[in-house]
Structures are given as C-alpha cells and as structure tokens.
C-alpha cells in the first residue's frame, strides 16, 4: 500500500515539541514501513529539519506550517492555509490518506481515488458533517465513537472504526518494583481542565508519609497550558506537599526514566468533552505505575477499577475526598500497589505499537478494496 499520514499545522514531526497525535503516527508510520508498505509522512517545516528526508523507512515531506495562535479563529484560518499546501504535496499514487487536520478532509474532495481516513483525535465540534469525502472516521475510544454518532446520521455509522491508541514506544525494559520510588506522578498539560487543583486539595487532606508529587508538562498557553499565573497559583495550592513542576519533557528516554521511577500515576481530568483516550495513563501503566483516574468514559476502555487501577468519582460533591481516599489506599498498601501494577503492565501487549499497527493495516486494506470495487463499478456504468 501507498500510505500518506498528513498531520496538522502546528507541531513538527519527529515530535520534538510533543503532541500525542504526532507522537503516535510517527511510530505507527515506522511500523507500517516495517510491514512492507510505502509511507509518506507530511508535516510542518521546522528549523533544522530538511523539507524531505527518510527516517526509518518513512519518507518525510514538510510544508510551511505555523506557530499555534491564541485565537481559535486564527488557528482555524492558519490550519486551512497549511492544509491546502499539504494536500497538494500528496503523491498521486496514494492509496490512503490518514489525517487529523481540521481542513484536510474537505480539501481532499479533489482526490477521488485515495481512501480518506479521518483520525478523530479530539472530540468533534460539529465539523464531521462537512466531511462527505471521508471513507472512515477513526475513533480511539468508546467515548469518541459516541461523540461521532452524535454528529452524523445513523445511516453513516458504518463509516466509524474504533482502533485504540498504541503505546508510543517499544522494547520496554523489565520493571523492578523494589527500586521504584515514592513518587505520585502527573504527566500532561498544566491546564485548569486537568483537575490539578483537585489533586492539590486531595493530597493536602492526607499524610503523604514522605511521598513526593511530580508534575510533568507545559503550562505556557502556546503549548496548551493555562499560563504562568495559573502555574504559580497552583504551586501555592500544594502548600503541604513536596511538589516539583518539571515543565515539558519531550525526550522519550528521559520521560520513560521518570515513568520507571514513579509508583502512582494520577490523572484527575475534569474535561468531560475534551478527553478522547488518555495516552499518558496508558504510558504510565506500561512502566508499572498504578493509575488513578477520574470517572471519564474514555479511561474505561483500558482501566478497570480495582483490577488494574483505581477510578474515583469526580462528579460527586466531594471529589477531593474521593481522590484522597484512592491515593491513601495505595500509599497504605504495598501489596495492593504491586497487584494492580502487575495487571496494569498487560497494556504492553494489548496496546503495543506492533499489534495496533496490524489492526490499522487490516482496516486500511478493507477500505481500499471497497473503494476500488466501487470505482470499478462506477466506471463500468460510464462505459455502458
């Protein structure tokens, strides 16, 4: 197959500045290439990156992109400009185009032969009705499937595919639980919708018994955070705790080292309409962290309460008490931590890049064969 991965306007590939979607497709593209497919990955230009290069069997093409603006309206305009350039750089022999860009599925109307595979990486906001050219809406969780169904007629549900996100790394080392440290970790954007103030209230309620809090992620608005003032106020909220804000860490080996040392991973997101999958908890589980997550639907695809993690009710009148009780349970019981962590490690198999890549390839082949058969039938009628 000739596969094109078309990313958005604001993050470079390789994902030096982060971006969960860019990170995922960068790894998946390499797996597709290992399986013998020709892969072209289109992304924004970035200083130090050539306009074209080959990385691990994947042909990378880069077009002029943009820095994320604060204005959502301006963001959509810049994405449109970028997407038009990016679509024009797609090779003519392409069999399938995978894209998470807002405008690309619309501009791909001009390409009548390639399958258009829309990766609905964020909760849709009304745009799906404009994607008449899309052969598939790929959801990464049951929560996203439900959101897609809210935007398209029931007669179009057959276009929905559910394929989970894979782990963005391979060849993980064995976990030695004896050398893990008393660290409660959060990785993600330092944003008000992520429930970090709730986490602060929760840990202030209990005796942490020497456990440390580590928060990894950007707070700058340009990188999806809530800003410097928010971060400074958040530091004050953790008044009774030993807390460290590291800022963003994009180096995979350094991030994995942090995961490997941590014992508990807390992701108390309050984003009812924002979270689609929860890659950070999945990554943490693969390194033997016990996840504690809020009761959002997206997490339930891979976290089962008291089986491989803990889920607390963030919608109750006392969510801080609920979260505090979950943290305290794990601090108090080493056996509970280890039992849950051993089960959490199974995501290394269920969500490996190799396994998920093969799921995608099977899906791609079905869609490509279906489109070819449909085009052949249309051409047959034209000749009559």
Describe each PLM feature range.
Residues 138, 171, 176-194, 200-205, ...:
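Conserved donor-binding/catalytic core segment of Leloir-type glycosyltransferases
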Residues 286, 290-293:
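Short hydrophobic beta-strand element within catalytic cores of glycosyltransferases
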Residues 329, 336-350, 362:
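A short, well-ordered alpha-helix in the C-terminal region of glycosyltransferases
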Residues 126-128, 135-159, 167-172:
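A short, active-site helix/loop in glycosyltransferases that binds the activated sugar's phosphate group
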Residues 227-253:
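Nucleotide-activated donor-binding/catalytic signature segment of Leloir-type glycosyltransferases, i.e.
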Residues 260-276, 289:
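Acidic donor-binding loop of glycosyltransferase active sites
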Residues 9-13, 31-73, 221, 295:
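N-terminal strand-loop element at the rim of the active site
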């Amino acid at each position: 197959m000739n596969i094109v991965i078309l990313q958005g306007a604001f993050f470079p590939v390789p994902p030096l500045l982060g971006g969960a979607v860019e990170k995922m497709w960068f790894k998946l593209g390499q797996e597709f290439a290992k399986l013998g497919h020709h892969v072209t990955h289109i992304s924004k230009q970035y200083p130090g990156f050539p306009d074209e290069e080959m990385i691990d069997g994947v042909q990378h093409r880069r077009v002029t992109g943009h820095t994320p603006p604060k204005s959502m309206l301006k963001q959509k305009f810049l994405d449109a400009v970028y997407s038009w350039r990016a679509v024009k750089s797609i090779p003519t022999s392409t069999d399938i185009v995978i894209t998470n860009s807002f405008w690309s599925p619309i501009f791909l109307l001009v390409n009548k032969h390639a399958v258009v595979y829309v990766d609905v990486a964020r909760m849709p906001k009304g745009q799906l009705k404009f994607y008449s050219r899309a052969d598939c809406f790929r959801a990464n969780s049951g929560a996203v499937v439900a959101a897609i169904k809210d935007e398209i007629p029931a007669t179009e549900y057959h276009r929905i595919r559910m394929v989970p996100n894979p782990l963005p790394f391979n060849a993980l080392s064995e976990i030695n639980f004896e050398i893990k440290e008393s660290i409660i970790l959060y990785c993600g954007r330092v944003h008000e919708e992520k429930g970090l103030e709730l986490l602060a209230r929760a840990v202030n309620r209990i005796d942490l018994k020497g456990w440390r809090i580590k928060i990894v992620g950007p707070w700058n608005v340009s990188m999806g955070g809530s800003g410097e003032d928010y971060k400074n106020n958040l530091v004050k909220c953790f008044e009774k705790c030993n807390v460290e804000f590291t800022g963003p860490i994009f180096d995979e080996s350094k991030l994995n080292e942090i995961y490997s040392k941590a014992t508990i991973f807390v992701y108390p997101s309050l984003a009812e309409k924002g979270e689609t999958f929860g890659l950070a908890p999945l990554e943490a589980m693969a390194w033997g962290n016990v996840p504690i997550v809020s009761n959002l639907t997206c997490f339930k695809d891979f976290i089962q309460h008291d089986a491989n993690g803990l889920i607390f009710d963030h919608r109750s009148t006392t969510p801080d008490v609920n979260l505090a009780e979950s943290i305290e349970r794990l601090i108090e019981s080493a056996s509970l931590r280890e039992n849950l962590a051993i089960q959490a490690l199974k995501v290394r198999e269920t969500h490996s890049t190799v396994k998920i890549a093969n799921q995608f390839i099977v899906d791609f082949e079905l869609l490509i064969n279906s489109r070819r058969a449909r085009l052949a039938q249309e051409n047959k009628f034209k000749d009559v």
